[in-house]
Amino acid sequence: MRIACLPLSLALLLVPATASADFTAFLGSTTTPVNRVVTGASIGAGLVIVGFEFEYARTSEDLPELAPGLRTYMFNGLLQTPIPIAGMQFYGTMGGGVYHETLSERSETNFGVNVGGGVKISLAGPLRLRIDYRVFTLSGDPLHSKPQRFYAGLNLKF
């Protein structure tokens, strides 16, 4: 049985994987310390199961609520289902990068990491709906070190 599996395993390793890329523009909500709008975009590339993306997101500050503005610039790795299941491709992600937090005259720029997951739902052709949840851990001296974010966005696969 093992001898029969060896040629099949070698054949699978030698078959070239198709690369794909995608772009997402998103709108969502950050819940820390109060609900506020977050906007952003990401561009990524991937093979069958492993992918990578760069993402930028922005949340405006809300002075009356003492909620800081936050900009994140993150590079993330993704593990995803190799094929869509019922038109949905699930993924988990983690990564790191730089953040900039501001509230009035106070500002903090430092390193942050994030972990999360989501799903890309096929709509028509290369157009998909992307739903994503992330938890950030911000180093340094931010006002809120564990902000959370939920978003939905239009994703174009190319």
What are these regions (language model features)?
Residues 24-26, 99-101, 137:
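Extracytoplasmic loops and strand-loop junctions of Gram-negative outer membrane beta-barrel proteins
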Residues 44-113, 121-125, 129, 150-158:
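Gram-negative (and chloroplast) outer-membrane scaffold detector with strong preference
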